[in-house]
């Protein structure tokens, strides 16, 4: 796999599919007529959800939750997601069990476009995109 591209999500590879993840925002904080964009700037200083972001960062650890897409390892090609919350006790267990061998099994019987290409690059995809 070469070139620059954005990998949004591979079927069955999203942490949301584990049932341990949730995206959070407060619709009451959006300006009238503004739709949610789920962009990091919305959660940064000057953004609609900055105070929510500060509250989450301070309080989530007290309840075994974390923001897994905030301080990414330099080898990962995944964007920051300050809205993405993970329940650590279950997410860590799922993460330990999730491997490149699991995805092709999950895809059996499904019509996944590009599956052969994805399968041939699963090791690289896992090392660069799976958190």
Curated annotation (Swiss-Prot):
Molecular function as annotated in GO: peptidase activity
GO biological process, one term: proteolysis
Source organism, top-level taxon: Bacteria
InterPro entries reported for this sequence: Bact_PeptidoProc_Enz, Hedgehog_sig/DD-Pept_Zn-bd_sf, Pept_M15B
PANTHER family: D-ALANYL-D-ALANINE CARBOXYPEPTIDASE, PEPTIDOGLYCAN L-ALANYL-D-GLUTAMATE ENDOPEPTIDASE CWLK
Protein name: Uncharacterized protein HI_0100
């Amino acid at each position: 796999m070469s070139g620059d591209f954005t990998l949004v999500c591979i079927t069955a590879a999203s942490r949301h599919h584990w049932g341990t993840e949730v995206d959070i925002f407060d619709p009451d904080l959006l300006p009238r007529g503004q739709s949610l964009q789920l962009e990091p700037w919305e959660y940064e200083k000057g953004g609609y959800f900055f105070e929510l972001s500060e509250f989450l960062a301070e309080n989530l650890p007290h309840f075994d939750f974390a923001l897994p897409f905030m301080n990414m390892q330099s080898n990962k090609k995944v964007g920051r997601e300050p809205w993405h919350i993970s329940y650590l006790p279950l997410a860590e267990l799922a993460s330990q069990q999730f491997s490149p061998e699991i995805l092709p099994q999950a895809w059996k019987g499904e019509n996944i476009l590009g599956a052969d290409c994805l399968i041939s690059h699963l090791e690289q995809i896992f090392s660069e995109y799976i958190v």
